[in-house]
Structures are given as C-alpha cells and as structure tokens.
C-alpha cells in the first residue's frame, strides 16, 4: 500500500486537517493507495510556494533549466518500476505504464531542448529612433490539471513545457491516479529543480470542484491547462474566463478511422484494433468510429473481428490477459448501457460485449446509426462501431458528423487522395495510414470543436506558457504633439 502525501514547497506533508481518501484496485478491491485529501488552505499554500519559487526559477539561465529537466527525464525513466507498482490504482496493464514512462521521459527531454527556443522579435517602428521588441517572458504560476487514463504522460505534459518556459507549477492530481501524479512531483523534486518549483495537490473526489475553483481563482495563478472530459473542461474553461486566466483545454474525442475503397485492409485492421482497444479504449485519441467504404466493409469487418477475438481482457496480473481493466465497475455499467442501447435499436453485435465487474471484453458493433447513443457519445471504453458509406464524400460527412474533433485517421493507397481528404476532416490531428492513437513530444497536440482549444507539445505550447510583451527603447529625442 502506498502512502501519498502532498508536495508543497519541497516538503511532503499531510493535509492540514489530516484527512485522507483511498484508491483501490478496480479488479481485486485491494487497497493501493492512501492519499492526503487537501483542504482549501493546502491549495493556497501550494500556489504560495510556487509563487515564492518563481523569481529564482525564471531567472535561471536556460541551459541550467535544461540540465535539470534532462536529469529529471533520466530519473523518471529509471524509476519505471515505481510507476508500474502504482498501476493498480486504475487497473491498467504494466505495458501501458511502461509506455507512459518512456513517452513522459521524452516529453521532459523535448521540453529541455526548448529552453533556448523561447524567441522574441524586433518589429520596425514608425517612431523615429524607437527600437521596438516583442519579448516572451515566463507568466508565473501555471496550474496543470491532469487525468488518470494516461497518468504519467498527461501529468508530465501538464508541467514540462511550463517549466521549460520559466514558470513554476501546481499539479492538481487526479483522484483516480494520485500516487502516480505524486511520484512525478517527487521525481522532479529529487532531480533538483528546487523547492516549490513543482507542487502536487491531491484531493478527495467530493472536494474536487471547490479545490479546482480555489486554485483557478488564486491571483498568483496566471495560466491553466486541463486534460479531461469535455463536461469538466467546459467548467474549467468558464472558471478560467471568469478570472481572466488563459486556459489550454484538451478534451474528449470520438476519433474516426476512414477506410477508403483502395485501403490496405490488413494495415487498417491492425491500426483499428490498436486504436480502439489499447488501454481498454481509455485514451482521448481512441478509435471509436470505423467509417468504411461499402465496397470493402464486409471484408474489413470480418478481418477485424478475427483480430479482436485474440484480444482477451482480464486481470492485469494474469499473464493470459492482453487487455486490462476499466478504471472502475461504474465505467463498465455506463459503457454496457451504450452497447445495449445500440443493439436494441438494430445494431449488430459482431463480437464482445461481455462485462464482469470492471472487465469489459473488446466490442465491435456494425450497423450503428444516428438514432443510437453510441453514434455520438464518447464511450471511453473498448468499443468500436462500424459506419458504412459509399464514396469518400459520404465517409467525410460521417467523419465530421460529431461534436468532437481531436484525432482522426485515413487509410488509402493513394496518398495524394488521402492528404486532400485529411485537409477536410474536422480534427486537430489526422494520420494517414496510421492509427488515431499516436503522440510525440515535439508535435502540436490539440483539438477543435468540443475537443478543446490550444496545443500542447514543443513550440506550439510556448505561446500559451509565456507572456508576449511589447518593449521599446527610444534612442534620441522624440517629438510630442503637446
């Protein structure tokens, strides 16, 4: 069992009132972590610690910030076993957490490489003798709110580029993966970033709303970033706007994978299975809609069903399990209701659908239409639906018939045709002949429509995590009209 204290000003500490909450393995019910439940005063203290640490961190030479972030990346990767030990909080497979650690370490390395890329520019002025500059400077305290589903990747992403840009951070840990998020903070602390540069707050589920509001409302918090559901993202966006804090929001998705009539079906099937079922479909980029040309749909469905038959979900501790657990049994109940609704309205259950507690077998449905909840609602589970259309215009219309727009994929042997189509798909990300689930630390990552706004990743995120300022230097006398 893991004890999870708060991290405030470089110190591990309990909540001020001593309260804790527990996180149990969704499969076995075993107690995984006992976690400090922060009070509003703890939230204030975390922001105050970050604010106090900001001047020194912002003043560090960029190469020194780079050195410390690189050290953190090495330590993160070296402590992979500790992260895997905490995987029981969400019922995830060890290979998923191993993948998380590798990508998160690369995110820190990429952020380290960006410390010297925070560029300004000289802008010609109409005023004689005026030297005008646009400068990017650190903002101050950045609040990162991270989810549980890819806990190492997404919590690291929430703080890596803010740190590279010279900001200090408060990480609001997920109630479902608090030990993982707290461990990230400890790794950065142990790497020598400095007391208060990274602070981690955990809270009981019932306290989440008031803790988030308190953090956003704090005048010292200058930027907010949030990854999570569209429902909660709207709340975070509204709170941030009320307090005039720019927010970067990466929200829900219902990614389409388009299979054109000339696609390599074997490649499309492999990408679809990976994109739909890896980590039990609990990824914002997960392939939820398989939009297939009618000419090849029957063959595609048959091949995908055969692939899905090899993907057994079970207890992650069982070596026979290819896939793991949902985050909890209530997620299974919710997703099963979506499946049952589709079947009741005429969809064909091709394979899967069996639910035992938090274990849901990978599911494929055909014949889904707009009358069914699965057509529009994000399942966030191991469920993919087949939508058939005749010709690429019909496929495009189906792909764009969604409130979401995060990731998408197109399979075609004609790359020119696919590229032209990709430019018309309403998504922040589109991969040709690759899966919808794909992330690299240096790439711009963000969505459109109800999937949020702004981009994480490399240069794209510098704009959000710095303040652009206009500074002038007057050389010589200046004429004034009065």
Swiss-Prot record:
Enzyme class, UniProt record, top EC level: oxidoreductase
CDD domains given in the database record: ALDH_SaliADH (cd07105)
Catalysis: reaction(s): vanillin + NAD(+) + H2O = vanillate + NADH + 2 H(+)
Keywords: NAD, Oxidoreductase
Gene3D superfamilies cross-referenced by the UniProt entry: Aldehyde Dehydrogenase, Chain A, domain 1, Aldehyde Dehydrogenase, Chain A, domain 2
Active site (UniProt): 250, 284
InterPro entries membership: Ald_DH/histidinol_DH (IPR016161), Ald_DH_C (IPR016163), Ald_DH_CS_GLU (IPR029510), Ald_DH_N (IPR016162), Aldehyde_DH_dom (IPR015590)
One function term, GO molecular function aspect: vanillin dehydrogenase activity
PROSITE patterns, alphabetized: ALDEHYDE_DEHYDR_GLU
Sequence positions that bind NAD(+): 228-233
Top-level division of the source organism's lineage: Bacteria
Pfam families, sorted: Aldedh
EC number annotated for this UniProt entry: 1.2.1.67
Known role: Catalyzes the NAD-dependent oxidation of vanillin to vanillic acid.
Family under the similarity heading: Belongs to the aldehyde dehydrogenase family.
UniProt-recorded name of the protein: Vanillin dehydrogenase
Organism: Pseudomonas fluorescens
């Amino acid at each position: 069992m893991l004890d999870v204290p708060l991290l405030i000003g470089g110190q591990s500490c309990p909540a001020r009132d001593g309260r804790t909450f527990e996180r149990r393995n969704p499969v076995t019910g075993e107690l995984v972590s006992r976690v400090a439940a922060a009070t509003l005063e703890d939230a204030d203290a975390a922001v105050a610690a970050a604010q106090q640490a900001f001047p020194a961190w912002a003043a560090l030479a960029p190469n020194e910030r780079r050195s410390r972030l690189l050290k953190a990346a090495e330590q993160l990767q070296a402590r992979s076993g500790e992260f895997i030990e905490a995987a029981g909080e969400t019922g995830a497979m060890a290979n998923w957490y191993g993948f998380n650690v590798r990508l998160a370490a690369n995110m820190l390395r990429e952020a380290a490489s960006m410390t010297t890329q925070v560029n300004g520019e000289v802008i010609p002025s109409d005023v004689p003798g005026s030297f005008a500059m646009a400068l990017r400077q650190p903002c101050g305290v950045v609040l990162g709110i991270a989810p549980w589903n890819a806990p190492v990747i997404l919590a690291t992403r929430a703080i890596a580029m803010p740190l590279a840009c010279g900001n200090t951070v408060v990480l609001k840990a997920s109630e479902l993966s608090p030990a993982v998020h707290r461990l990230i903070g400890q790794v950065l602390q142990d790497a020598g970033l400095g007391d208060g540069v990274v602070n981690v707050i955990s809270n009981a589920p019932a306290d989440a709303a008031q803790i988030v509001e308190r953090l956003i409302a704090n005048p010292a918090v200058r930027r907010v970033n949030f990854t999570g559901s569209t429902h909660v993202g709207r709340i975070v966006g509204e709170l941030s706007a009320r307090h005039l804090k720019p927010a970067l929001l990466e929200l829900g998705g219902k990614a389409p994978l388009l299979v054109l009539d000339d696609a390599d079906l074997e490649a499309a099937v492999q990408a679809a299975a990976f994109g739909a079922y890896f980590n039990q479909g609990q990824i914002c980029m997960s392939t939820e809609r398989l939009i297939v040309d009618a000419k090849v749909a029957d063959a595609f469905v048959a091949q995908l069903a055969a692939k899905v038959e090899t993907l057994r979900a079970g207890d992650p501790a069982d070596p026979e399990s290819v896939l793991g657990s949902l985050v909890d049994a209530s997620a299974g109940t919710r997703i099963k209701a979506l499946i049952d609704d589709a079947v009741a309205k005429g969809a064909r259950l091709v394979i899967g659908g069996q639910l035992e507690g938090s274990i849901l077998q990978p599911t494929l449905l055909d014949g889904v239409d707009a009358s069914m909840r699965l057509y529009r609602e994000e399942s966030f589970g191991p469920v993919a639906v087949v939508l058939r259309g005749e010709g690429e215009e019909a496929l495009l219309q189906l792909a764009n018939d969604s409130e979401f727009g995060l990731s998408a994929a197109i399979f075609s042997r004609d790359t020119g045709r696919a590229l032209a189509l990709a430019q018309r798909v309403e998504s922040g990300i589109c991969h040709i002949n690759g899966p919808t689930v794909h992330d690299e630390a240096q790439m711009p990552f963000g969505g459109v429509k109800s999937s949020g706004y702004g981009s994480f990743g490399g240069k794209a995120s510098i704009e959000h995590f710095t303040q652009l300022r206009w500074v002038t230097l007057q050389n010589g006398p200046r004429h004034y009209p009065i």
